[in-house]
Every structure is written in structure tokens, then in C-alpha cells.
Amino acid sequence: YFFVNQESFWQNDELSDLENCHISLYRNHFSENEADRYLSNLKKINWKQNEIVVFGTKHLEPRETAWFGDSGVSYKYSGIVHKAKPWFPLLEDIRVRVQVASGAIFNSVLLNRYRDENDGVAWHADDEPELGAFPTIGSVSFGASRKFQLREKSRKGEIFTTFLHHGDLLIMHPPTQQHWLHCVPKSRKKTTERINLTFREIV
């Protein structure tokens, strides 16, 4: 089911009863001033554009990433092993806010920097073994509004769409990752920078 704060989550009003999908969306969870300050500071971290192999061919990921977390935490996705850099106060502040809203504990965060409309992330689920059987994912958006889409794993059926805006918090509760895929598609319209933080617990 969906819980939505302040406005309708999806363009389709009938989605409140989606099976095996539990998503909470808090619009403007971070005030405009807070979101501006966080975005300004997060731009300064050491971003990296990783190289991945798709069907035997090397490609640069269409976004930049950074990985932070507790000591010793590592995470593998798209064939890349990420070793966490230590938390710093600004990230700690955001983590506390997300933990309070979600009721979950997070020991790491993956940051994605979408530089413009040419950056995105393909269909996927955050269901790697390191995340445990029933992960909760806390996703914070700063910067440009971008489309967020969702569809069932079991069939290539209807795609459900919303936009995530500056300061929004989206929480994907279990069992969402087991049954649904999500993506941030590249945009046909010119966009500016967006930074997304996805908090998670590595077990």
C-alpha cells in the first residue's frame, strides 16, 4: 500500500492498493532552506563516474556516485565493489532524519549525482544479498525534479510514474524490493543537477 503526505503520489489515483508495494512519500520533508544548504555542500564531495560492463562491453555509468557508511561496510552492485567512506556531520544529520521517518536503522548511504538530463538509472531493484531479505530503502532528493517510475518484476505491464522534488523523502518498505523494479529515466527535457541519497542497511 502507499502512504502519501500532502499530495497524490502517482498520476494514477487507483494505486493505493498495489499488491506487495509499500511506499511512503513525504513531500518537502526537508525545507527549501535545508535542501538548498544540503545540496550546496553535497556538490563538494569527491564524486566518481564508474565503469561497468554490459554484455561484454565497457560503459561509463550515466551518473556519478559516492558511498559512505560505517567502518568496514562494503557493497557490490553492477559488478562494482564499493568500500564506504566515513560519515561526516552533514550526512549524519540527514541519516537521523530519515531513520526517524522510516523507523529503520541505516549503516550506509549510496549517493547518486545526476548531472543533467542525460544521466539516469535503469530498471532495477535494491535486492542484493548484502541488503538482507526484506530491506527498507530511504531515498532523499535534492536539486532538480526528476521522474521516478515503478513496475512489477513479474511482468512488463503498466508503469507508474511520479516526480521527486527538491527536499522530498521517499521510503520503500518491504516487501517492495522483492516484487517491484524502479528507475530514474533520462529526461527529454533539459534539466539541472539532482543529488539523490539512498540510505540502506548492509547486513
Residue positions per predicted region:
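Non-heme Fe(II) oxygenase metal-center motifs and adjacent flexible, charged/small-residue loops
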Residues: 1-203
